[in-house]
Amino acid sequence: MAEHLELLAEMPMVGRMSTQERLKHAQKRRAQQVKMWAQAEKEAHSKKGHGERPWKEVAGLRPRKHVLFPPSVALLEAAARNDLEEVRQFLTSGVSPNLANEDGLTALHQCCIDDFQEMAQQLLDAGADVNARDSECWTPLHAAATCGHLHLVELLISRGADLLAVNSDGNMPYDLCEDAQTLDCLETAMANQGITQEGIEEARAVPELCMLNDLQNRLQAGANLSDPLDHGATLLHIAAANGFSEVATLLLEQGASLSAKDHDGWEPLHAAAYWGQVHLVELLVAHGADLNGKSLVDETPLDVCGDEEVRAKLLELKHKQDALLRAQGRQRSLLRRRTSSAGSRGKVVRRVSLTHRTNLYRKEHAQEAIVWQQPPPTSPEPLEDEDRQTDAELRLQPPEDDGPEVARPHNGQVGAPPGRHLYSKRLDRSVSYHLSPEENSAPDALVRDKAHHTLAELKRQRAAAKLQRPAPEGPETFEPGLSVDAGTSQPDCGFSTIGDPPLLKLTAPSEEASVEKRPCCLLM
């Protein structure tokens, strides 16, 4: 028979053969195989002829396979098959009924899962622990209550099962029970034992209190709380996985590392997210845990989280953390810009501020000039409250004394003394502009006392200008063409302090002397 390497070497040649050639080649190889087999059989018979007999003929028996299993495996396998006789033999031979497999599961756990009441009775009679716990702290009562096996629950309670046993998820048997009759049995038993809600909460807090006491003992001994334990996990990993808020708070106060990783690259936040501990997730993130931390297989806490509530909380915290980091980045960038230009930036801002203020004043002066240069409206506008007040003030004006002509202000400024402000009632208005800053201004400019006006005051001055026209040159006397309306009288000289005197209305003559128009104000 050809060797394996020889067959591999001839494969390219066989691939180039035709169908008939391949068939002949296969027959040749088959003949070689039969020949070699016949030769091997001949050699075997020749050895038997020389006195070498097979061991079967010498012993007269078939060989027995000796495969041995540990007692724990054998007991659990027999209990899973519900083999009462075999289990009885194991127990009689001295095998402990509390033997467990690698997951901490005992034969009694298996009976409560499979609903083998007689097997459970036999194990309990042999001394099985009714409160045995597996690797996740489940007792046989947890298993029976979860599966809804009422008769097994009653049996375990009668044998002293702990009704307040808490598993690694913080659940008691009645928390896991969904069958109504089984749940009623558990609640009745708890009521008979006098268990209250306070007792339930205390029982839930027992594991955390035990770990808290252990931590305090370690602190007194000066131990490092960040040292890794089994599988590289730290105490903060354990607290995060079990939801121990007080323990985690103490560890964080003592400086426990939030970035410590176990052998799988998991940080404490990974453990809290995987086991659905939403309070621990918030606590760790509040102390600066990295929501983007990755394990050895590039898994973030969000990737390993299977609980929808915890997942939503992680997403919310991630959005808040990203927004906070962006805000801090902007503040740092702004601080760097301010620091780099601290030598000259203040002066530039002040120069720009003064220029802007000057331009604003100039714009206001230009707007005021446009208002003064507009022609009076053709139709009389209805007087507002401020116009009525202007009319009342005009009635208080004294007639001008006879004498040589004096310089008149333009646009019908009333003839009050220069130091007298006609709008004393409006001095509380805000000052909007300043026309003439010089102390000695020309007669046609506003004096300093009248330099501050608002647009409403200018409107009143224009209303007053309609009622009073400039007289022709010469002594200030009434012309023959001027007439006084009926029902009015000449006002007294001086300002009257009581009441409002009647308004003197004058009718202009048909021909007026031309008066040279001057600009109303000076633009600075």
Curated annotation (Swiss-Prot):
Residue positions of covalent lipid attachment, annotated as S-farnesyl cysteine: C521
Region spans: Disordered: 368-421, 462-524
Tissue specificity statement from the Swiss-Prot or TrEMBL entry: Highly expressed in testis, followed by liver, heart, brain and lung.
Entries under InterPro entries matching the protein: Ankyrin_rpt (IPR002110), Ankyrin_rpt-contain_sf (IPR036770), Pase-1_reg_su_16AB (IPR017417), PP1_Regulatory_Subunit (IPR051226)
Keywords: ANK repeat, Cell membrane, Coiled coil, Lipoprotein, Membrane, Methylation, Palmitate, Phosphoprotein, Prenylation, Repeat
ANK repeats: 70-99, 103-132, 136-165, 231-260, 264-293
Protein's recorded name: Protein phosphatase 1 regulatory subunit 16A
Gene: Ppp1r16a
